[in-house]
């Protein structure tokens, strides 16, 4: 009889252990079951990001993304993964009004998707919310620096940390949500020296995850479509690890040419009579 091997899915606590052991944390975004299945073996966590609004739906920002959209795609990612921790973004408007609103929506995400954690944007001003959630059994990943849900108040997608006092403010944000119980903090779009100072601060227990920050972070994350060359526009911090857009276009062109010429479908692609 063959032996069934059960893979234990990683949990939030495992990321803290990796930080303590000095092991780099690897993460990517995913929105579909098939891409989630591909990255599952290589990632410690997979983020179902509200960036799906821009990547999947062509939105100008993440602001129109709804909780229902996040739940639907998180369900798909859970079906495609077996090993990686799955973290789901709390979309704009789903947690800011009150701690109670945040808990009800976060609990819904975890119950309806089976995901292992939620992520919310904001620093010290949301520390009480982070504590409220973690005290009630919801693992929380924070997000500081360039927070896309604040694009309108930031005046656009602007790198953080250039101004006087920015390092102190960002460090205070990281400390506050770490002390509130966040197991990890995404640090996005922060100038390198400031990001490095925060990432190497021994008082910050949470694992730091960089995206346009510093190699000193405990781990790194990228949007999968950006690093594969599928996106039209990518930020400076993205390194291209593939050019799938060109390969897809070439395949589609070949298909269209063969259909037009009557070469597809050939005999091998049709069903003969019995």
Swiss-Prot record:
Keyword field: Cytoplasm, Magnesium, Metal-binding, Pantothenate biosynthesis, Transferase
Compartments, as annotated in UniProt: Cytoplasm
Residues that coordinate or bind 3-methyl-2-oxobutanoate: 50-51, 89, 119
One record GO biological process: pantothenate biosynthetic process
GO terms for MF: 3-methyl-2-oxobutanoate hydroxymethyltransferase activity; magnesium ion binding
Enzyme Commission number(s) of this protein: 2.1.2.11
Active site (catalytic residues): 188
Domain of life, per lineage: Bacteria
Residues involved in Mg(2+) binding: 50, 89, 121
UniProt cofactor(s): Mg(2+)
Keyword Metal-binding annotated: yes
Note on how the cofactor is bound: Binds 1 Mg(2+) ion per subunit.
SUPFAM superfamilies assigned to the protein according to its UniProt record, in alphabetical order: Phosphoenolpyruvate/pyruvate domain (SSF51621)
Family matches, as Pfam families: Pantoate_transf
GO CC terms, sorted: cytoplasm
Disulfide linkage: none
Pathway where it operates: Cofactor biosynthesis; (R)-pantothenate biosynthesis; (R)-pantoate from 3-methyl-2-oxobutanoate: step 1/2
TM region positions: none
Catalytic reaction annotation: 3-methyl-2-oxobutanoate + (6R)-5,10-methylene-5,6,7,8-tetrahydrofolate + H2O = 2-dehydropantoate + (6S)-5,6,7,8-tetrahydrofolate
Family: Belongs to the PanB family.
Purpose: Catalyzes the reversible reaction in which hydroxymethyl group from 5,10-methylenetetrahydrofolate is transferred onto alpha-ketoisovalerate to form ketopantoate.
Assembly behavior: Homodecamer; pentamer of dimers.
Protein name (Swiss-Prot/TrEMBL): 3-methyl-2-oxobutanoate hydroxymethyltransferase
Gene this protein is translated from: panB
């Amino acid at each position: 009889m063959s032996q069934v091997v059960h893979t234990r899915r990683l949990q939030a606590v495992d990321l803290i252990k990796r930080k303590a052991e000095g092991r780099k944390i690897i993460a990517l975004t995913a929105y579909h079951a098939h891409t989630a299945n591909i990255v599952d073996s290589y990632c410690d966590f997979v983020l179902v990001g509200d960036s799906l609004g821009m990547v999947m739906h062509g939105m100008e920002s993440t602001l129109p993304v709804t909780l229902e959209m996040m739940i639907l795609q998180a369900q798909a990612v859970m079906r495609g993964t077996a090993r990686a921790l799955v973290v789901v973004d709390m979309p704009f408007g789903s947690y800011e009004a009150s701690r109670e609103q945040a808990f009800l929506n976060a609990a819904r995400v975890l119950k309806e998707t089976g995901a292992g954690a939620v992520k919310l944007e904001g620093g010290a001003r949301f520390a009480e919310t982070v504590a409220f959630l973690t005290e009630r059994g919801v693992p929380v990943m924070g997000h500081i620096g360039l927070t896309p849900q604040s694009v309108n108040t930031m005046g656009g997608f602007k790198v953080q940390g250039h101004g006087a006092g920015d390092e102190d403010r960002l460090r205070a944000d990281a400390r506050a949500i770490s002390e509130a119980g966040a197991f990890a903090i995404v640090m996005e779009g922060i100038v390198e020296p400031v990001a490095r100072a925060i990432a190497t601060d021994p008082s910050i227990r949470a694992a730091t995850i960089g995206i346009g920050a510093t190699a000193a972070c405990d781990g790194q994350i990228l949007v999968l479509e950006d690093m594969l060359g599928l996106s039209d526009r990518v930020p400076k911090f993205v390194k291209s690890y593939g050019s799938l857009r060109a390969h897809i276009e070439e395949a589609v062109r070949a298909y269209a040419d063969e259909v037009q010429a009557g070469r597809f479908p050939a005999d091998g692609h049709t069903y003969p009579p019995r």
